């Protein structure tokens, strides 16, 4: 890897940890808060320096548009030939009716053309977030969560799951006897799901986030 200054290495490591933990990179404001910068502009300067050194790629106009480059053991990231010139057409899922598939036509309100560099892996759809249970993970009411369809997930990943008739976004942790779905907001309770529960179904994992107004 290109030699980085101590501060640049801190920023790079923070981005990498955020992607490993949540599936998407931090915002400039989150980097500034975590590393004690005076403002998000200071974080932006370090990001531009990292981009010039070829270790990250920045997507213009997106607060989480950061992608790691040239890191052999980095989390898998979506790459395409000429990715900057290509667009993904992603369906936006709004409210989901009980008992029907998330990607049923009646749940899709529209499609968005998105730059693939915004995401850590190729997503299958965008889910409009409702509520603040994941606030401390930087996921706010009205955000669009990029989701990759999966039937399995690792501990610590942010997932989309069905619980009975509801669809929820939580952090997954395995516990003796089942799974714990962890809220990233102390005002909300965690949810324990017993092993083999027929009410639980994993719908996918978070691979990116688009703040309302960024598209």
UniProtKB/Swiss-Prot annotation:
Signal peptide range: none
Q: Which reaction does it catalyse?
A: Hydrolysis of Ala-|-Gly bond in repressor LexA
PANTHER family tied to this protein: LEXA REPRESSOR, LEXA REPRESSOR-RELATED
As for family, the record states: Belongs to the peptidase S24 family.
UniProt keyword list? Autocatalytic cleavage, DNA damage, DNA repair, DNA replication, DNA-binding, Hydrolase, Repressor, SOS response, Transcription, Transcription regulation
BP GO annotations: DNA repair; DNA replication; negative regulation of DNA-templated transcription; proteolysis; SOS response
Per the UniProt record, the source organism is Burkholderia cenocepacia (strain ATCC BAA-245 / DSM 16553 / LMG 16656 / NCTC 13227 / J2315 / CF5610) (Burkholderia cepacia (strain J2315))
Q: What is its EC number?
A: 3.4.21.88
Catalytic site: 133, 170
According to the UniProt record, what class of enzyme is this? hydrolase
Q: How does it assemble?
A: Homodimer.
Q: Tell me, what is one Gene Ontology molecular-function annotation carried by this entry?
A: serine-type endopeptidase activity
Q: Per its database record, what is this protein's job? A: Represses a number of genes involved in the response to DNA damage (SOS response), including recA and lexA. In the presence of single-stranded DNA, RecA interacts with LexA causing an autocatalytic cleavage which disrupts the DNA-binding part of LexA, leading to derepression of the SOS regulon and eventually DNA repair.
- Record's protein name: LexA repressor
What residue ranges does this record give for the DNA-binding region?
28-48
Q: Which NCBIfam families match?
A: lexA (TIGR00498)
Which pairs are disulfide-linked? Answer: none
List the residue(s) that the UniProt entry marks as the site Cleavage.
98-99
């Amino acid at each position: 890897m290109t030699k980085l200054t101590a501060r640049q290495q801190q920023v790079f490591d923070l981005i990498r940890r955020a992607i490993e933990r949540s599936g998407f990179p931090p915002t400039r404001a989150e980097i500034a808060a975590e590393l004690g910068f005076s403002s998000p502009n200071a974080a932006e300067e370090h990001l531009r320096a990292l981009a010039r050194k070829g270790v990250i790629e920045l997507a213009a106009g997106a607060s989480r548009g950061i992608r790691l480059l040239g890191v052999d053991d980095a989390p898998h990231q979506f790459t395409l030939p000429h990715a900057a010139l290509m667009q993904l057409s992603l369906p936006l899922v709004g409210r989901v009716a009980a008992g029907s598939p998330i990607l049923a036509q009646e749940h899709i309100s529209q499609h968005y053309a998105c730059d693939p560099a915004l995401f850590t892996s190729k997503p299958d759809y965008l889910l409009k977030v409702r509520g603040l249970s994941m606030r401390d993970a930087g996921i706010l009411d009205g955000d669009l969560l990029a989701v990759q369809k999966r039937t399995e997930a690792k501990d610590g990943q942010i997932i989309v799951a069905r619980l009975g008739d509801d669809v929820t976004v939580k952090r997954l942790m395995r516990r003796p006897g089942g799974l714990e779905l962890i809220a990233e907001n102390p005002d909300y309770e965690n949810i324990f799901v017993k092993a083999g529960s027929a009410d639980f179904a994993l719908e996918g994992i978070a691979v990116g986030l688009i703040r309302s107004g960024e598209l």
